[in-house]
Amino acid sequence: MSEIPEKVRKRVASLRDELDYHNHRYYVLDDPEIPDAAYDALMRELQDLEAKYPELVTPDSPTQRVGGAPLKAFEEARHLLPMLSLDNAFEEADVLAFEKRIRDRLGEESEIEFAVEPKLDGLAISLLYEDGHLVRGATRGDGATGEDVTANVRTIRAIPLRLQGRGWPKLLEVRGEVYMDRAGFEAFNREAASRGEKVFVNPRNAAAGSLRQLDSRITAKRPLTFFAYGAGHVEGGELPDTHAAVLDALAEWGQRVCPERDVVTGAAGCLEYYRRIGERRDGLPYDIDGVVYKVNRFELQQRLGFVSRAPRWAIAHKYPAQEQMTLLRDVEFQVGRTGALTPVARLEPVFVGGVTVSNATLHNMDEVERKDVRIGDTVIVRRAGDVIPEVAAVVLSRRPHNARHVVMPTHCPVCGSEIVRSEGEAVARCSGGLYCAAQRREAIKHFASRRAMDIEGLGDKLVEQLVDAGLVDHVDGLYRLTAEQLAGLERMGEKSAHNLVDALEKSKHTQLARFIFALGIREVGEATARALAIHFGGLDALMAADEEALMQVPDVGPVVAHHVATFFQQPHNREVIDALREAGVHWEESEPAALQAEDLPLSGNTYVLTGALESMTREEAGDRLMALGAKVSGSVSKKTTAVIAGEAAGSKLAKAEKLGVPVLSEAEFLELIGE
């Protein structure tokens, strides 16, 4: 017998302690601290060491048992047959070796038939039916003894309280998985967050926490569901002789079984099924972490038997982990095309979801604070399919004493403009909309759009080319373009280039309302832009207005007033506006309506325009109404003064008639405005 190195003994002892700790958190507290992949890695390391040094194997090793002892808060429920876990396969070679072990043990020359199904990420339970009636529901617990959760199980509508059909045994144990599907999980978390309550990290935690509530009324409010995956103890009757046929029978008796189940032949069939489900994994309505292969014929299962903690006739083939632990090195802030700031975690590179991840989104500062993410933390990173990797949770037990809080910058990391965050909003934004390089593409596209400066021929793709070629940095750069520069772009001939230069020249003569809208100020749509233009009469007066003055404008509240004032306070934005004026952009200014707003004839009235007018556009009609002190709304309500209906008026007219709101014809509208 070879001497066992002391460091091996210490490592084995350390692994057992760590696995026992995580067993307790996972099986007993239902509050796992590390992802399944990290636990699996620890277990495999211990298995490998015990295989190499069998003298170190002890009866209490985590490799020799299923889990930990159940909590005492529920009554104990002893299983009539042990509920064992499954061994795992991570690579194709593991599946081939699994099949070879089976064939060697059975002495089979022909290929083995396997029942295959997705491995749901939920909570395993046992349902006991006596004379067709549900009499007990129990968690797996340590495999021999679980917890009696009958009252909670009865609240899950996917679980029948009475079996259907006929032919079921007098005593039948159904085994399956309680889980929360993705839609239910997301809806539950949204509602919990809106109430300021705790949200769950993932559907598995949500299912486990919900099923183990001491008050079944709480469980009843949670969107739990169930899939049966097999039968356990049976008395007073017989079941079919294959696993697949048993699932079919359970379905006939009213149990919910997974529609993705199948029967395949040999390891090749198993691997093809693994690939097929893997391709559809992200589109399934529930989370899975692998697929399960079971020898289909029970007679062969009985011949194969069990090892200490798992059956020889089944294995779980895991997909690349969608969650992993790693170190959060730093947090940086990215500026999106609309100016939104997103905190991004810079990570110690980790392999997760099939790729190496070194960056992950933290979404916004509300999420950072809710999860209490700090620089230096060990975090759980999640990546599913093509979804951007995210920091799902913090492993608080591994937080170092020098972990640093994440601090939101006060100025844009791209352009230096002030960062603003409106009350009640999760997202902070850069206020340098016209100047910020991160926002330039969207700013130029909006500026050129039909309802803004209406630059004919300047579409989104051409804007992309102009920015990529370095010809335009900010919107004022559009008016410095030459036909020669434009002709050199892809799909831009000499004629098209001259046409665009002419369109740019034509757009210089505009309306103040259009120009204000073209600036892309947050929350300022066409109607608000018109209201601002009418109220102040000129751009200089608008730029000089403080928030209090802005709130005197019809339909402008504190949020919009703050956005407008902040926009014009930024030196970079003012520089771009000055450059546009120097380039020749101009409009006709008027006397500010603010001087006599309360005395205007339509002050206090609200109108809605619908259909096509013959005498003017709806936009022009709205300007006339606002010039007379009225508000123009896009929707009809009981507070609407009247609806002005042109030709082909639509649903707004119908709603006005339903609410009893007066309807004016075009002739009545012209009379109203004095024309």
UniProtKB/Swiss-Prot annotation:
Assigned protein family: Belongs to the NAD-dependent DNA ligase family. LigA subfamily.
Chain sites annotated for binding NAD(+): 36-40, 85-86, 117, 140, 177, 294, 318
Any one GO BP annotation for this protein: DNA replication
Record-listed E.C. numbers: 6.5.1.2
Function comment: DNA ligase that catalyzes the formation of phosphodiester linkages between 5'-phosphoryl and 3'-hydroxyl groups in double-stranded DNA using NAD as a coenzyme and as the energy source for the reaction. It is essential for DNA replication and repair of damaged DNA.
Protein name per its UniProtKB record: DNA ligase
Cellular component, GO, one term: cytosol
Annotated organism of origin: Thioalkalivibrio sulfidiphilus (strain HL-EbGR7)
Domain BRCT: 597-675
Positions that bind Zn(2+): 412, 415, 430, 436
Chemical reaction(s) catalysed: NAD(+) + (deoxyribonucleotide)n-3'-hydroxyl + 5'-phospho-(deoxyribonucleotide)m = (deoxyribonucleotide)n+m + AMP + beta-nicotinamide D-nucleotide
Gene field: ligA
